[in-house]
C-alpha cells in the first residue's frame, strides 16, 4: 500500500472515530456522575465490538497501529470535550486510549517475541534509557519532597509522556508510518486553528479554557482546546514550521498553496495570542532555517556575521542590558501595593529567582518531582502575585529534578538537533528533507517559546513532538543500515 493511500485510509478512520466519539460524548456533556460513567462504558463496549469486528478483516499489527494513530490524534484534543474527574486524577480520551494501547502492548509482549526484535533494532536506546532514568530519579526524589501527593501527580504526567514516547518509537520504525504521524499533526492543527479563529472572532471559549467566562478584555485571545493562549501559541510555534517545510518540499502546487495559507493562519493566531516568547521562537526558527538551507561557503560567512552582530549589539547596549538585568535579578526587592499586580516581567523574574533559590537550597538535586509549584505557593522568597508555576520549562526541570536531569534533557535535545542536521547535510530526498527541516526548526522554536506556558509537563503535545523527533532519528538511522524496508 502506498504512503498516500495508507495516509488517506488512516486519516479517514481517524476522522470517523473522533467524530463518532465527540457526538456520543456531546450528547451527555451536561450530565455527571453515573451517566458520565455509563457513557464511558458505552464507548469502551463499542470500541471492543469494533476491535473484534476489525480483527476479522485486518492483521493485528495494522489494527494496533490504527489504535496508535487514533491515540496520537486524541492527544491534540486535551480535556476540551470530555473528562472524568476522579478526585486526585482525571481521565481524558487520550489517557483512556493510552491505557488501552499499553494493555495491548503488554498482551503482545506475552504472546510473541517480536517486541524483543523491535527493541534490538532501535537506534535510540540511550535516549529512551535517559527518560527511564529521569522517571526513576523522580521517584527517588519523593524521599525529600515536601509534598508527596503533588510529586505523584507530576510523576503520573511524566510517566504517561515517557510511555507514549516509548510506544511511538517502538512501532513507528518505517518512513511510511512516520509520515502518517506527521500528517496527523498537520490535520489536527487545522482543527485546532479553526477553534482558535472561532475564539478570536466570536469571543466564545471552550469550558476547558481559563478565558471561559473570564474577563471581557481578554476574550479576543484564541485558546482553542488549551488552558490558555500561551499554551496554544507554543503549540503553533511548532506547527508553523511543519507547514513551511511542507510548502518547500512538496512539489504539488495545490499542497504548496495550502501549506502557505496554513502557515500564515498559524502566524496570525500567534500574533493574536500576544505571546512574545512564541514570536521570538518563530524568529529563532526562521533564522536557523535560513542558515541550514545556505550553501556551505555562505554558512561560514553567516556564522561570522552573526557572531560579529551579537558582539556589536552587546557592546552598544551593554549598559542597558546590565541595568535591566540588575533591576530584575540583582536589585533588592521593593514593596508594592497588594491592590496592584506586579508588572509581568518583574513577576516572571521573581519566579526565576525563587526557583533558583530553591535549587541552591536543595544542593543542586532539586526540590522533588513537581514540588517547585508547592514551594512557590508556600515558601516563596520573592513576591509572585500568588503565581505558583515557574513559566520556564528548563528552569522547571532544574528546580524539580536538579542539575543532572536538566543538563541531560538539554543534552538529549541538542543531540537530536545535531543528528537531524547531519542527516540533512547528506542531500536526502524531499520526504526526508521535509521531516528533518521541519523538526530542526520546530525544535529551535519550541526551546525558545517554552518560556511562555506556565508549565510544559501537562502539555501532552510536547511529548508527541519529542516522540516524533526521536522516532525520526531512529528511522533515519535505520534507513542508513537497511534502506529498502524503511521506505516501503
From Swiss-Prot:
Question: Per UniProt, what is the name of the gene that codes for the protein in this document?
Answer: tuaE
Native organism is: Bacillus subtilis (strain 168)
Q: What else is known?
A: The nature of the anionic polymer present in the cell wall of B.subtilis depends on phosphate availability. Under phosphate-replete growth conditions teichoic acids are present, whereas under phosphate-depleted conditions, at least part of the wall teichoic acid is replaced with teichuronic acid, a non-phosphate containing anionic polymer. The synthesis of teichuronic acid is accompanied by degradation of teichoic acid and reutilization of liberated phosphate for other cellular processes such as nucleic acid synthesis.
Relate the induction remark in this record: By phosphate starvation, via the PhoP/PhoR two-component regulatory system.
Keywords for this entry? Cell membrane, Cell wall biogenesis/degradation, Membrane, Stress response, Transmembrane, Transmembrane helix
Keyword Cell membrane recorded: yes
Q: Name one Pfam family in it.
A: Wzy_C
**What is the name attached to this protein's record?**
Teichuronic acid biosynthesis protein TuaE
What subcellular locations does the record give? Cell membrane
Question: Which NCBIfam families does the record cross-reference, listed alphabetically?
Answer: TeichurnBiosyTuaE (NF047675)
Q: Which GO terms describe its biological process?
A: cell wall organization; teichuronic acid biosynthetic process
Pathway it belongs to? Answer: Cell wall biogenesis; teichuronic acid biosynthesis
| Bilayer topology | Multi-pass membrane protein
* Function comment: Might be involved in the polymerization of teichuronic acid repeating units after their translocation to the outer surface of the membrane.
Please indicate if the UniProt record lists NAD as a keyword: no
Amino acid at each position: 500500500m502506498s504512503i498516500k493511500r495508507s495516509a488517506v485510509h488512516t486519516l479517514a478512520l481517524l476522522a470517523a472515530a473522533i467524530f463518532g466519539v465527540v457526538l456520543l460524548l456531546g450528547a451527555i456533556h451536561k450530565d455527571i456522575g453515573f451517566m458520565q460513567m455509563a457513557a464511558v462504558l458505552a464507548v469502551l463496549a463499542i470500541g471492543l465490538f469494533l476491535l473484534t469486528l476489525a480483527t476479522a478483516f485486518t492483521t493485528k499489527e495494522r489494527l494496533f497501529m490504527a489504535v496508535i494513530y487514533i491515540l496520537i490524534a486524541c492527544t491534540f484534543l486535551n480535556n476540551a470535550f470530555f473528562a472524568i474527574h476522579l478526585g486526585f486524577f482525571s481521565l481524558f480520551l487520550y489517557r483512556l486510549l493510552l491505557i488501552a494501547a499499553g494493555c495491548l502492548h503488554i498482551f503482545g509482549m506475552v504472546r510473541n517475541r517480536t517486541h524483543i526484535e523491535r527493541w534490538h533494532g532501535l537506534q535510540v536506546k540511550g535516549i529512551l534509557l535517559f527518560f527511564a532514568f529521569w522517571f526513576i530519579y523522580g521517584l527517588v526524589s519523593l524521599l525529600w519532597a515536601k509534598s508527596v501527593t503533588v510529586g505523584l501527580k507530576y510523576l503520573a504526567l511524566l510517566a504517561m509522556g515517557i510511555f507514549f514516547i516509548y510506544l511511538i518509537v517502538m512501532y513507528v520504525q518505517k518512513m511510511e508510518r512516520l509520515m502518517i504521524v506527521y500528517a496527523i499533526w498537520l490535520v489536527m492543527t487545522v482543527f485546532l486553528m479553526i477553534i482558535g479563529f472561532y475564539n478570536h472572532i466570536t469571543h466564545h471559549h471552550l469550558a476547558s479554557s481559563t478565558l471561559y467566562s473570564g474577563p471581557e478584555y481578554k476574550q479576543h485571545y484564541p485558546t482553542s482546546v488549551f488552558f490558555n493562549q500561551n499554551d496554544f501559541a507554543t503549540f503553533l510555534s511548532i506547527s508553523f514550521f511543519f507547514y513551511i517545510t511542507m510548502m518547500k518540499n512538496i512539489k504539488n502546487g495545490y499542497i504548496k498553496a495550502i501549506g502557505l495559507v496554513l502557515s500564515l493562519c498559524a502566524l496570525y493566531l500567534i500574533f493574536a495570542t500576544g505571546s512574545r516568547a512564541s514570536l521570538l521562537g518563530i524568529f529563532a526558527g526562521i533564522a536557523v532555517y535560513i542558515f541550514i538551507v545556505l550553501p556551505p561557503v555562505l554558512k561560514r560567512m553567516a556564522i561570522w556575521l552573526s557572531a560579529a552582530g551579537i558582539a556589536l549589539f552587546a557592546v552598544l547596549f551593554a549598559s542597558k542590558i546590565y541595568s535591566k538585568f540588575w533591576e530584575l535579578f540583582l536589585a533588592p526587592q521593593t514593596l508594592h501595593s497588594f491592590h496592584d499586580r506586579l508588572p509581568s516581567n518583574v513577576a516572571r523574574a521573581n519566579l526565576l529567582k525563587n526557583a533558583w533559590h530553591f535549587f541552591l537550597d536543595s544542593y543542586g538535586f532539586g526540590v522533588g518531582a513537581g514540588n517547585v509549584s508547592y514551594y512557590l505557593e508556600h515558601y516563596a522568597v520573592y513576591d509572585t502575585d500568588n503565581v505558583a508555576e515557574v513559566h520556564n520549562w528548563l528552569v522547571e526541570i532544574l528546580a524539580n529534578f536538579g542539575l543532572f536531569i536538566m543538563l541531560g534533557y538539554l543534552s538529549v535535545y541538542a543531540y537530536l538537533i545535531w543528528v537531524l542536521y547531519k542527516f540533512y547535510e547528506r542531500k536526502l530526498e524531499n520526504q526526508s528533507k521535509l521531516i528533518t527541516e521541519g523538526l530542526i526548526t520546530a525544535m529551535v522554536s519550541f526551546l525558545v517559546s517554552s518560556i511562555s506556558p506556565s508549565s510544559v509537563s501537562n502539555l501532552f503535545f510536547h511529548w508527541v513532538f519529542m516522540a516524533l523527533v526521536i522516532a525520526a532519528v531512529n528511522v533515519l538511522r535505520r534507513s542508513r543500515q537497511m534502506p529498502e524496508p524503511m521506505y516501503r
